[in-house]
Structure formats: structure tokens, C-alpha cells
Amino acid sequence: MTESAKQEGDVPAGARELLLQTASDIMREGDIVDISLSELSLRSGLNSALVKYYFGNKAGLMKALLDRDMAGIVQAVDALMAKDMPPEARLRRHIGAVVDTYFKTPYLNRLLMRLVRESDDDEAHRIADSYLTPLSRAYDKLIEDGVRQGVFRNVDPQLFYFTTTGAADRFFSSRLVLKHCYDTDTLTEELRDRYREHCIDFIMSGILATR
């Protein structure tokens, strides 16, 4: 597919974004970290050749999806950290946002680990420098601000990061456990809301300083 073909309108408007969102939907609904190009084409209504046109290959599509999802997270965290608000309120809002993120993209951590593992060193460092390091620094500041103001116990920000993200990732990537132990494999908004409230209460109880 040539550039002239694109200019002539052979490529539907918004096709790149539609391919990414359809891939996201397929992985979320199937609780998987892979897609078939035939299903992607069927679900999106687009020619699978557009994957090569926009992303080079399926691996490029998966990398672009990770970039889309992780860039959105970093931007949201940066915006939250820029707000003038008390550390406790900021952390409560962040924990809720983490739960919402993994409800929307339960494949995220598995996709991240897969791409880091399968990438060469340069690409793995790019992923870390672009997304993981900024998030780590945000957690450092988030916890340090609360400790300095006497609101939070002096916990390790690195371990707190894994506690918070791990709680959300584990729950929303455990559909088989929900199915076989609790007779449900549907991630409903009601379930998300219940788990969000649970995580906020549970995690905040562990970090708030005794008053």
C-alpha cells in the first residue's frame, strides 16, 4: 500500500487507531496477550495488510499498543502529580485510577513483560526509560511528600509500587479463577467499583500513619 494510495483515500480515516483499539478489545475479552490477524481484520472491518502498512508486522502492532497504553498512564500520573492536593487525597485517587486502568486493559502488565523479555537491550531500555522510570520517580515523590507531612508511614516506594499495581493486575488477569471458584468470568463495572473501593481502603490502611 503506497503513500499515493493513502492520499487517494484507500486507507479509512482513523484506521490505525481502530486497529489498536480492536487489538486491545480482543485481548481484554479473551484474557490473552496475543491476537490473530484474521480476527483483527474481521473485528475491525479492515484489511489485515494495514497492519504491515502502519506497524511493519504484528510485533510492531503490539509495541504500538503498549506505547499507547503506557503513554496514557504516564501522562495521567504526571497530571495528578502536578495538582495541588494533599498526599492522602492524591494517593486515593491514584489507587482508584490504577484499578480502572487494569479493568480497561487487564493484559497490560503481561504485555509489558512479554515485550521487555522478547526485545533487544535497546528496546527494553527504551520501554523502561519511557514508562517505568517516570512512574518510579512519581511514586518516590508521592510517598516522600506524605512521609514528610506525617501522613504516611515511611514505606519503601518501590515495594509500594509493586503492591499497588500487583493488586490490580492480579485481580483483573485472573478470569479463570473467577470462573472456576466464583462462578463468574465477566469483568463488570459493578465488580470493578467494588474492587476499587476495597483496594483504596485496604492499601490506605497500610500506609497511613497512626494518628
Describe each model-derived feature in a short phrase.
Residues 29-33, 84, 105, 149:
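Short coil/turn segments at alpha/beta junctions that flank glycine-rich nucleotide-binding fingerprints
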Residues 2-4, 104, 133-149, 153, ...:
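C-terminal peripheral helix-coil segments that are non-catalytic and often amphipathic
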Residues 3-6, 65-93, 142-144:
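Amphipathic alpha-helical linker/stalk segments
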Residues 15-23, 40, 65-69, 73, ...:
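Generic hydrophobic, amphipathic alpha-helix propensity
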Residues 22-26, 167:
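Short amphipathic alpha-helical elements of helix-turn-helix/winged-helix folds
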Residues 78-110, 157-164, 193-196:
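Hydrophobic alpha-helical connector segments
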Residues 100-138, 159, 185-190:
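Short secondary-structure transition hinges
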Residues 18, 26-60, 64:
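Helix-turn-helix
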